[in-house]
Amino acid sequence: QDQKSYENFWQSNKLEAKGGSNVTLSSNKVNFTFMPVAAKITISINYASSGGATTKYKNVTATLAGNGIRTGASSSETIEMLHTGDNTVASDKHTFVCILRPGANMSFKLSVSRTLDGASSPEATQQTFTQPAYTFGASKNYVYNFTSSDELILTSVEVMGFKETTVPDNPVSAT
C-alpha cells in the first residue's frame, strides 16, 4: 500500500465508533466517541557524521514488509511509508510515518533506500531492520529512532498514546 503521499497516508487512517457505551441518544442528539483502530509507526533516522563532515542523503524511501501488516491476512504485505520532509533536499535527518494494523505477534522488515548527496543513483545496498514478533496496539504511536553509518542502528523505541484533544460542546450545528 502506497502511503508515500499525504493523501494516501490520511486515507489509511480509520476511526470507529465502538460499543453501546460510546453511542448515546438524548434530546434528539446522538453522542458518540470515535476511536482509532490502527497503530502508527514513526521511523526517525539520524545519519552519522563522517570525520568532520555530515553525511547527507536525498530521495530516501522506507518500506515495511510483513504478513498481515495492513489487513491482517496471512500473506506478505508492504507499506511504502510517507516521508515527512522534502525528500528531494539532502539532509542528515529523515522521518517517515505509516499506519499499521494492530495485533499480536506482528513482525516486519524495514528497508531503506537512499542516494548520497551529489550522487545520481541510489546506493546498491538497502539498509534493513527486522522487528521481531510484537503486539502492536491501536491508538499507539511506535517511534523507532535510528542512527546510521553503513547500517541502521536502533537507539530507542518509544510507545506513545495518540494525543487527545478537546471538542467544543457544539462544534457543528445542524440548524
PLM feature spans:
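Short, low-hydrophobicity acidic/polar segments
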Residues: Q1-K56, A90-F96, L100-A104, K109-V112, ...
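Short, ordered, surface-exposed loop/turn motifs in non-cytosolic proteins
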Residues: S50-T84, D169, S173-A174
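Active-site/ligand-binding surface loops and adjacent short beta/alpha elements
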Residues: T84-A90
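Beta-sandwich strand segments
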Residues: A119-Q126
